[in-house]
Swiss-Prot record:
Classification via PROSITE patterns: HELICASE_ATP_BIND_1, HELICASE_CTER, UVR
Annotated InterPro entries: Helicase/UvrB_N, Helicase_ATP-bd, Helicase_C-like, P-loop_NTPase, UVR_dom, UVR_dom_sf, UvrB, UvrB_inter
UniProt keyword terms in alphabetical order: ATP-binding, Cytoplasm, DNA damage, DNA excision, DNA repair, Excision nuclease, Nucleotide-binding, SOS response
Gene encoding the protein: uvrB
Organism, as annotated: Parasynechococcus marenigrum (strain WH8102)
PANTHER family for this protein: UVRABC SYSTEM PROTEIN B
GO molecular function: ATP binding; ATP hydrolysis activity; DNA binding; excinuclease ABC activity
UniProt domain Helicase C-terminal: residue ranges: 429-591
BP-aspect Gene Ontology terms: nucleotide-excision repair; SOS response
Domain notes from UniProt: The beta-hairpin motif is involved in DNA binding.
Protein family (similarity comment): Belongs to the UvrB family.
Protein name, as recorded: UvrABC system protein B
Function of the molecule: The UvrABC repair system catalyzes the recognition and processing of DNA lesions. A damage recognition complex composed of 2 UvrA and 2 UvrB subunits scans DNA for abnormalities. Upon binding of the UvrA(2)B(2) complex to a putative damaged site, the DNA wraps around one UvrB monomer. DNA wrap is dependent on ATP binding by UvrB and probably causes local melting of the DNA helix, facilitating insertion of UvrB beta-hairpin between the DNA strands. Then UvrB probes one DNA strand for the presence of a lesion.
């Protein structure tokens, strides 16, 4: 068992010890599926950390978005400072997939912007999985996409060892084959340089350089050095340099793949010509032959991932190898917020196939492109060795496959109880809510209000503002950084009320919130389903005076179940507190965030500097551009305008509105050209 070193300033409390013991026994006993039903604020991440430490397995912690994955990674790194806690998410800052819109006969080429730091973290994760067992990888759903062939990636690693005799030309050739480029002037990640008897390499998975010092053909020393100062950071006896890309194809496999692609092209052209689809056949032949020429000459082409099945030597319909294939056989999967994450697994495959089908039918891609895909839900679960689902509201499927293996964790270390739930009539609900808000604001407490529609949220925000309530409105068009800033301002008391339609997805853990108001709670639907109601009620579960108000004229089944579950948890918590003499205390979570530290500096510069009004200028410029793309714009407004348009472009791509995203991309290019002069 690897030595996970769990470091924490506290020990398990409440029902954490029982939950930890039950889950550890289940994992060690071979249980394939278990569920941790943990209420908001009960320390589920700490319980996860204890289960990982006590079972000693390499672990994958799966989150349903990048932000939650980052939060989990930071927390687990604090718990395991001496172990490998890695972060694996999509490395695209912006990604617009290849698409074709038949209605308007519009082809949109793939456009992507890769974040080099995230790419480094992805390589760091796979390197750690090859070299040690005390590894925790926190990943988003992107981990179900193809990631090369682990065995080929490992086989391609170039090893250096102190005292060995090298054929240095052969080693340099291997580095080039592994997609490292030689640059004797400027060394960086994915590059190497050779000066005299010193070889320096920028590994794909490190922000440090590896320096190989030679004496003739013998390796005299291996060191990690700082790329900026040249300072020696660590001496090594041996080092493996893994490929700069996860997709590694040996020469013999590449030659076979080219032959297979040619044969598939012939078969597909026969089919298309037989169907009378001459334009599609001509298009496919031209595109594929160009790609084959590039593959034969340089081993790469744009869109090479569409030939992944042939390059990997897979059979038609077989699943791709992905991050989880880099884990050893006895790995442990922990699915955070499983009621959301599990449903995403199947959705990713379905969306991908719908887009690929159109490209294949219209001659843009060979049928084998459909096998460049994420895993199907069932394929993912076949690969999962043992799983712990974690949620305050586990889904029916998780509970079903877990059988009776459900560990309950409802007691908070702070002693805080679940909120009191009150149902009030909708007649006069806004005025009633206004009175509650004023009462909470007078005590320096915060309020969350959730409505059913965007229009209702806007109208309510306007009404509250007219009545001198400090209120903000959170909606889908607000960009990620601004969302974080709005939430931070609520915690800091810049305003008292946050109104939104779906506040669940924000992962809002706000100790200052003492009141959650749910308008139209009796309107059945996704936002008023049992699990959604429990999640929303839980937003007030970190405050000693937490209350949830449900405005409704009828008691729906979802409401009844949510209220019953909240009361059940509250009774358990109350009984525990009375038995152990615990007095509920407020959670002491500080309102700090590294991202927001940057925002504070940015805000100060805007207030103090000569460009304080740039944001307003850019806002007007954006509006003018929408009305008249050729409108004259001040150069100083362009950077902020480009940021706004990039945000819109990313939102359009997320919504699969590829035409709009492409138009925005073209506008941004024009603006950048204007800036360049």
């Amino acid at each position: 068992m690897p030595a996970y070193d769990l470091t924490a300033p506290y020990t398990p409390k409440g029902d954490q010890p029982t939950a930890i013991k039950q889950l550890v026994q289940g994992v060690n006993g071979g249980e394939r599926y278990q569920t941790l039903l943990g209420a908001t604020g009960t320390g589920k991440t700490f319980t996860m950390a204890n289960v990982i430490a006590q079972t000693g397995r390499p672990a994958l912690v799966l989150a349903h978005n990048k932000t939650l994955a980052a939060q989990l990674c930071n927390e687990l790194r604090e718990f395991f400072p001496e172990n490998a806690v890695e972060y694996f998410i999509s490395y695209y800052d912006y990604y617009q997939p290849e698409a074709y819109v038949p209605v308007s006969d519009t082809y949109i080429a793939k456009t992507a912007s890769i974040n080099e730091e995230i790419d480094m973290l992805r390589h760091s994760a796979t390197r750690s999985l090859f070299e040690r067992r005390d590894v925790i990888v926190v990943a988003s759903i992107s981990c179900i996409y193809g990631l090369g062939i682990p065995s080929e990636y490992l086989k391609a690693a170039v090893k250096f060892e102190v005292g060995e005799t090298l054929n240095i030309r052969s080693q340099l050739r291997e580095l080039v084959n592994n997609q490292y480029s030689r640059n004797d002037t400027e060394i960086a990640r994915g590059r190497f340089r050779m000066k005299g008897d010193v070889l320096e390499i920028g590994p794909a998975y490190e922000d440090r350089l590896v320096r190989i010092e030679l004496f003739g053909d013998e390796v005299e020393a291996i060191r990690y050095v700082d790329p900026t100062t040249g300072e020696i950071l660590q001496s090594l006896e041996t080092v493996n340099i893994y490929p700069a890309k996860h997709f590694v194809t040996p020469k013999d496999r590449l030659d076979s793949a080219i032959g297979e692609i040619r044969q598939e092209l012939r078969d597909r052209l026969d089919f298309l010509n037989g169907e009378g689809k001459l334009l599609e056949a001509q298009r496919l032949e031209q595109r594929t032959k160009y790609d084959l020429e590039m593959l034969g000459q340089v081993g790469y082409c744009n869109g090479v991932e569409n030939y992944a099945r042939h390059l990997a030597g897979r059979e038609e319909g077989t699943p791709p190898e992905c991050l989880i294939d880099y884990f050893p056989k006895d790995w442990l999967l922990i699915v955070d917020e499983s009621h959301v994450t599990c449903s995403q697994l199947q959705a990713m495959y379905n969306g991908d196939q719908a887009r690929k089908k159109v490209l294949i039918e219209h001659g843009f891609r060979l049928p084998s492109a459909a096998d460049n895909r994420p895993l199907k839900g069932e394929e993912f679960w076949e690969k999962a060795h043992q799983t712990v689902f974690v949620s305050a509201t586990p889904g029916n499927w998780e509970l079903e496959v877990s059988g009776g293996e459900v560990a309950q964790q409802v007691i908070r270390p702070t002693g805080v109880l679940d909120p009191i739930v009150e149902v009030r009539p909708t007649t006069g609900q806004v005025d009633d809510l206004l009175g509650e808000i004023r009462d909470r604001a007078s005590k320096q407490q915060r309020v969350l209000v959730t409505t059913l529609t965007k229009r209702m949220a806007e109208d309510l925000t306007d009404y509250l503002a007219e009545n001198e309530v400090r209120v903000r409105y959170l909606h889908s068009e607000i960009h990620s950084i601004e969302r974080i800033e709005i939430i931070q301002d609520l915690r800091l008391g810049e305003y008292d009320v946050l109104v939104g339609v779906n506040l669940l997805r924000e992962g809002l853990d706000l100790p200052e919130v003492s009141l959650v108001a749910i308008l139209d709670a009796d309107k059945e639907g996704f936002l008023r389903a049992e699990r959604s109601l429990i999640q929303t009620i839980g937003r007030a579960a970190r405050h000693v005076e937490g209350v949830a108000l449900l405005y409704a004229d009828n008691m729906t089944e979802s409401m009844a179940k949510a209220i019953s579950e909240t009361e059940r948890r509250r009774k358990i918590q109350q009984t525990y507190n009375e038995k152990h003499g615990i007095v509920p205390t407020a959670a002491g979570k500080k309102a700090s965030n590294s991202i927001l530290s940057f925002l504070e500096l940015s805000r100060k510069l805007k207030q103090d500097g000569p460009d304080a009004d740039l944001v307003q200028v850019a806002g007007k410029a954006a509006q003018a551009l929408e009305e008249d793309p050729d409108a004259g714009l001040a150069l100083e407004a362009l950077p902020e305008l480009i940021d706004q348009l990039e945000g819109k472009m990313k939102e359009a791509a997320k919504k699969l509105d590829f035409e709009d995203a492409a138009n925005l991309r073209d506008r941004i290019k024009q603006l950048r050209q204007k800036m360049a002069g």
